[in-house]
Protein backbone atom coordinates (compact mmCIF):
# COMPACT_ATOMS: atom_id res chain seq x y z
CA UNK A 1 0.00 0.00 0.00
CA UNK A 2 1.01 3.57 -0.55
CA UNK A 3 1.58 5.78 2.49
CA UNK A 4 -1.06 8.30 1.37
CA UNK A 5 -3.68 5.57 1.08
CA UNK A 6 -2.88 4.39 4.60
CA UNK A 7 -3.11 7.92 6.01
CA UNK A 8 -6.43 8.60 4.29
CA UNK A 9 -7.91 5.30 5.45
CA UNK A 10 -6.82 6.07 9.02
CA UNK A 11 -8.34 9.56 8.88
CA UNK A 12 -11.67 8.15 7.65
CA UNK A 13 -11.96 6.11 10.84
CA UNK A 14 -10.63 8.70 13.29
CA UNK A 15 -7.13 7.29 13.52
CA UNK A 16 -3.77 8.99 13.04
CA UNK A 17 -0.46 7.82 11.65
CA UNK A 18 2.34 7.86 14.19
CA UNK A 19 5.89 6.66 14.29
CA UNK A 20 7.26 4.62 11.45
CA UNK A 21 10.18 2.23 11.57
CA UNK A 22 12.38 0.75 8.91
CA UNK A 23 13.23 -2.92 9.01
CA UNK A 24 15.32 -5.16 6.80
CA UNK A 25 12.69 -7.91 6.99
CA UNK A 26 9.50 -5.93 6.42
CA UNK A 27 10.64 -2.71 4.81
CA UNK A 28 8.64 -0.06 6.64
CA UNK A 29 6.08 -0.33 9.40
CA UNK A 30 3.70 2.49 10.27
CA UNK A 31 2.01 2.77 13.65
CA UNK A 32 -1.65 3.82 13.56
CA UNK A 33 -3.58 4.77 16.69
CA UNK A 34 -7.02 6.17 17.47
CA UNK A 35 -6.90 9.96 17.43
CA UNK A 36 -7.55 11.63 20.79
CA UNK A 37 -10.14 14.37 21.09
CA UNK A 38 -8.62 17.81 20.65
CA UNK A 39 -5.39 16.34 19.27
CA UNK A 40 -3.20 18.46 17.04
CA UNK A 41 -4.05 18.33 13.34
CA UNK A 42 -1.65 19.44 10.64
CA UNK A 43 -3.04 21.64 7.89
CA UNK A 44 -2.20 18.83 5.47
CA UNK A 45 -4.34 16.34 7.39
CA UNK A 46 -7.14 18.90 7.64
CA UNK A 47 -7.14 19.23 3.85
CA UNK A 48 -7.10 15.46 3.48
CA UNK A 49 -10.15 15.31 5.77
CA UNK A 50 -11.95 17.96 3.69
CA UNK A 51 -11.34 15.87 0.58
CA UNK A 52 -12.48 12.65 2.23
CA UNK A 53 -15.68 14.31 3.43
CA UNK A 54 -16.41 15.68 -0.04
CA UNK A 55 -15.87 12.23 -1.54
CA UNK A 56 -18.24 10.70 1.05
CA UNK A 57 -15.53 8.52 2.58
CA UNK A 58 -15.43 9.91 6.12
CA UNK A 59 -17.13 7.62 8.65
CA UNK A 60 -19.06 8.70 11.74
CA UNK A 61 -16.07 7.71 13.89
CA UNK A 62 -13.84 9.91 11.76
CA UNK A 63 -16.31 12.81 11.98
CA UNK A 64 -16.29 12.65 15.79
CA UNK A 65 -12.65 13.69 16.09
CA UNK A 66 -12.53 16.36 13.39
CA UNK A 67 -11.19 19.80 14.33
CA UNK A 68 -12.49 23.07 12.91
CA UNK A 69 -11.89 22.51 9.20
CA UNK A 70 -12.63 26.02 8.00
CA UNK A 71 -9.56 27.41 6.22
CA UNK A 72 -10.20 30.65 8.13
CA UNK A 73 -9.37 28.85 11.38
CA UNK A 74 -5.70 28.92 10.37
CA UNK A 75 -3.75 31.98 11.45
CA UNK A 76 -0.18 32.98 10.70
CA UNK A 77 1.46 33.99 13.97
CA UNK A 78 3.05 37.44 14.15
CA UNK A 79 6.74 36.42 14.10
CA UNK A 80 6.23 34.31 10.98
CA UNK A 81 4.21 37.01 9.25
CA UNK A 82 6.89 39.59 10.12
CA UNK A 83 9.60 37.36 8.64
CA UNK A 84 7.60 36.93 5.43
CA UNK A 85 6.80 40.64 5.17
CA UNK A 86 10.35 41.81 5.92
CA UNK A 87 11.19 41.64 2.21
CA UNK A 88 8.35 42.82 -0.07
CA UNK A 89 9.42 40.32 -2.74
CA UNK A 90 9.04 37.43 -0.28
CA UNK A 91 5.58 38.60 0.79
CA UNK A 92 4.47 39.13 -2.82
CA UNK A 93 5.75 35.72 -3.92
CA UNK A 94 4.19 34.04 -0.89
CA UNK A 95 0.80 35.55 -1.68
CA UNK A 96 0.99 34.24 -5.26
CA UNK A 97 1.31 30.66 -4.02
CA UNK A 98 -1.83 28.51 -3.63
CA UNK A 99 -3.67 28.96 -0.33
CA UNK A 100 -3.15 25.30 0.60
CA UNK A 101 0.59 25.59 0.02
CA UNK A 102 0.72 28.68 2.23
CA UNK A 103 -1.14 26.97 5.07
CA UNK A 104 0.81 23.70 4.89
CA UNK A 105 4.22 25.38 4.75
CA UNK A 106 3.49 27.91 7.51
CA UNK A 107 1.93 25.20 9.68
CA UNK A 108 5.14 23.20 9.29
CA UNK A 109 7.07 26.19 10.65
CA UNK A 110 4.67 27.14 13.42
CA UNK A 111 4.25 23.58 14.67
CA UNK A 112 7.88 23.60 15.80
CA UNK A 113 7.06 26.36 18.29
CA UNK A 114 4.06 24.41 19.62
CA UNK A 115 6.34 21.49 20.37
CA UNK A 116 9.17 23.58 21.88
CA UNK A 117 11.69 23.06 19.12
CA UNK A 118 13.10 26.57 18.55
CA UNK A 119 16.09 25.49 16.44
CA UNK A 120 13.85 23.52 14.12
CA UNK A 121 11.45 26.50 13.98
CA UNK A 122 14.27 28.86 12.95
CA UNK A 123 15.59 26.41 10.37
CA UNK A 124 12.16 25.88 8.81
CA UNK A 125 11.36 29.59 8.80
CA UNK A 126 14.69 30.36 7.14
CA UNK A 127 14.04 27.69 4.49
CA UNK A 128 10.54 29.02 3.81
CA UNK A 129 11.84 32.57 3.33
CA UNK A 130 14.78 31.40 1.20
CA UNK A 131 12.60 29.29 -1.10
CA UNK A 132 9.90 31.96 -1.28
CA UNK A 133 12.28 34.73 -2.33
CA UNK A 134 13.39 32.39 -5.14
CA UNK A 135 9.67 31.88 -5.95
CA UNK A 136 10.02 28.13 -5.36
CA UNK A 137 7.43 25.88 -3.79
CA UNK A 138 8.87 22.84 -2.03
CA UNK A 139 7.89 19.75 -0.11
CA UNK A 140 4.83 17.55 -0.15
CA UNK A 141 1.87 19.89 0.19
CA UNK A 142 -0.78 18.58 -2.21
CA UNK A 143 -0.38 14.78 -2.02
CA UNK A 144 0.90 14.57 -5.60
CA UNK A 145 -2.11 16.53 -6.85
CA UNK A 146 -4.84 14.68 -4.90
CA UNK A 147 -5.62 17.79 -2.90
CA UNK A 148 -5.72 20.21 -5.82
CA UNK A 149 -8.91 19.23 -7.65
CA UNK A 150 -11.46 17.18 -5.77
PLM regions: where:
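Charge-dense, helix-prone N-terminal extensions
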Residues: 1-150
Amino acid sequence: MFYLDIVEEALCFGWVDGLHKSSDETGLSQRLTPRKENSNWTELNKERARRLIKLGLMTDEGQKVLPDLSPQSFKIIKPVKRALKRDPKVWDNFNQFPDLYQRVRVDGVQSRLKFSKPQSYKHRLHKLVKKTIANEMYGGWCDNGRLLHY
